[in-house]
Amino acid sequence: AVEVLRGVNMTVYPGKVTALVGDNGAGKTTLIKCLAGIYGLDGGAILWEGKEVNIPNPKAASALGIEFVYQDLALANNLDIVQNMFLGRERMSGPFLNEEAMEDLARETLAGLNVTTIKSIRQQVSSLSGGQRQSVAVAKAVMWNSKLVVLDEPTAALGVAQTAQVLALVRRLADRGLGVIIISH
């Protein structure tokens, strides 16, 4: 049998940014996919807030307060910012979408992260810059009372100014008391 991860021990603290750095093929993505509930563990344990937890699927990770911003951002270009932030988690008012509540929470979340470069929350995601798209993806992750946000290569395809903007956003997440993991090479 092939061992992919062995002897891994990582601690992430609230209010701190932890870097997960390694060469291609080192196991960074595999480790994070275990934390996301995409891959199961053959051995070892995941401790969450001091207790051993089983994370059998991504929904279980979200229920614990673990959210992910993947390198491709997982945003739908044909939808606007609000639609992307609530995709799969839409707010309802009876049988109808509660657009007003979703707009309010999206606006509040972006403002809370000090995202000021977006003109309208009803703007199509396809019209956003790389830094703005990254900000929307991060806001989507923190909107659900997350405790830990994992960012996979958050500045990979960004220019200098956009990189500075995203790193400032990451710092604000930690300042709000969230644990943050940044995956990088």
Regions found by a protein language model. Name each.
Residues 1-185:
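Glycine-rich phosphate-binding loops of nucleotide-dependent enzymes
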